[in-house]
Swiss-Prot record:
Disulfide cysteine pairs (residue numbers): 40-48, 42-60, 62-71, 79-158, 96-139, 128-152, 162-296, 202-218, 210-285, 310-379, 342-358, 369-397
Leader sequence residues: 1-20
Protein's UniProt name: Urokinase-type plasminogen activator
Protein keywords: Disulfide bond, EGF-like domain, Glycoprotein, Hydrolase, Kringle, Plasminogen activation, Protease, Secreted, Serine protease, Signal, Zymogen
Length: 434
């Protein structure tokens, strides 16, 4: 009898103490499932592990700062961003019911038994979440013989962090300088799989944890055929193109929304703007770090002065005659050029429309080039870097009297907002059956 009790206690210790030093020594990595973590569904860099003598027992070994069965809980999160849709912290209000509470499962629209519960942040806990896109995180509380959605008051909204970088560090886009990704943490690299190989296509800018803004001409097809989303990947936090970076985040493309009025028939690229919705295999969006941050969108009526100093960044060619793209992220400074000069002095009013803004180096030594398309032109406004333009087109690279032409982002704020909200609404409209 004592032997049976001893063996039972020992087995329980082995099963429940997976995150201890003992388990790190006696558990092995489940190489069979590691690449996609399909059985464990480990998030946030968690590792699927299995016990040597109990191969059917699989759990996630979480990195520091994360917990939960799938490493889905951010134990360090103390505030929420936006409306808190992506909040995965541990805040709870008095009276919050567990998401797997029988009353919640029976009466609630959102609960731990949904097929997409893990992606919504729901589980065997009562932490505040926002699975339906309300104004802030909430939880279910009892209301007599029913339950109700109650906004959480114990957690506050994070201070706005867009357009801020951890530091500015430049090392030598045409005539520019090598840049660490921390100086341009909103820069995105869009890759296309061609014959089994991921090849760099265009740049982009992270404007929301789930959204990248880029140029429509990157996906333009004269036949109007919709691009195949499955062949694209988006990288964030990447300083060097063809090497793995420990700080990078990799995403699949969930949606590609190009402006319906994009055209290149005038000789320029008009309405050259596109939105990309990104997600990981587990349904997550970008996680903020020193290497990955959002850039601020401009105010609707923002009109910066001529000669305002701005920055461009990308992985494009350093010279128009180069065969290969730059391996490192490059950055350069340009000055805004008046609309009148751009239309009449450097180009013409047919190619340059009011949907565009021009910028160039006074000495014509630095410029965006092939491969920088879709990338950011950011200008400082109210102490934050603001996405004022999207690299669109030009006549050569750093060619005298031929400045770069950029999509004027202020002209598309309503389009950006309406399309992001439309996709959000669509994604919420297909509710899981109870």
């Amino acid at each position: 009898m004592k032997l049976i009790i001893f063996l039972t206690v020992t087995l329980c210790t082995l099963v429940t103490g997976l995150d201890s030093v003992y388990i790190r020594q006696y558990y092995k990595l489940s190489h069979k499932h590691r690449p996609q973590h399909r059985e464990c569904q480990c998030l946030n860099g968690g590792t699927c592990i299995t016990y040597r003598f109990f191969s059917q027992i699989k759990r996630c070994l979480c990195p520091e700062g994360y917990g939960g069965l799938h490493c889905e809980i951010d134990t360090n999160s103390i505030c929420y961003s936006g409306n808190g849709e992506d909040y995965r912290g541990m805040a709870e209000d008095p009276g919050c019911l567990y998401w797997d509470h029988p009353s919640v499962i029976r009466w609630g629209d959102y609960h731990a038994d949904l097929k997409n519960a893990l992606q919504l942040g729901l589980g065997k806990h009562n932490y505040c979440r926002n699975p339906n896109g309300r104004s802030r995180p909430w939880c279910y509380t009892k209301r007599r013989y029913s339950i109700q959605e109650t906004p959480c008051s114990t957690i506050e909204k994070c201070e706005r962090t867009c357009g801020q970088r951890s530091f500015s560090k430049y090392f030598k886009i045409v005539g520019g300088s090598q840049a660490e990704v921390e100086t341009q943490p909103w820069i995105a690299g869009i890759f296309q799989n061609i014959m089994g190989t991921d090849q760099f296509l265009c740049g982009g800018s992270l404007i929301d944890p789930c959204w990248v803004l880029t140029a429509a001409h990157c996906f333009y097809n004269p036949t109007k055929k919709q691009p195949n989303k499955s062949v694209y990947k988006v990288f964030l936090g990447k300083s060097i193109l063809n090497t793995n970076d420990e700080h990078e985040q990799v995403f699949m493309v969930d949606e590609i929304i190009s402006h319906p009025d994009f055209t290149d028939h005038t000789g320029g690229n008009d309405n050259d703007i596109a939105l990309i919705r990104i997600r990981t295999a587990s349904g997550q969006c970008a996680v903020e770090s020193n290497y990955v941050r959002t850039v601020c969108l401009p105010e609707k009526n923002l009109n910066l002065y001529d000669n305002t100093w701005c920055e461009i960044a990308g992985y494009g060619k350093q010279n128009s005659y180069d065969i290969y793209y730059a391996q490192r992220l490059m950055s350069a400074t340009v000055n805004l050029i008046s609309q009148d000069d751009c239309k009449n002095k450097y180009y013409d009013s047919t190619r340059v429309t009011d949907n565009m803004v021009c910028a160039g180096d006074p000495l014509w030594e630095t410029d965006a080039c092939k491969g920088d398309s879709g990338g950011p032109m950011v200008c400082e406004h109210n102490g934050r870097m603001t996405l004022y333009g999207i690299v669109s087109w030009g006549d050569g690279c750093a060619k005298k009297n031929k400045p770069g032409v950029y999509t004027r982002v202020t002209r598309y704020l309503n389009w950006i907002d309406s399309n992001m909200n439309a996709v959000f609404t669509k994604s919420r409209s297909f509710r899981e059956p109870k």
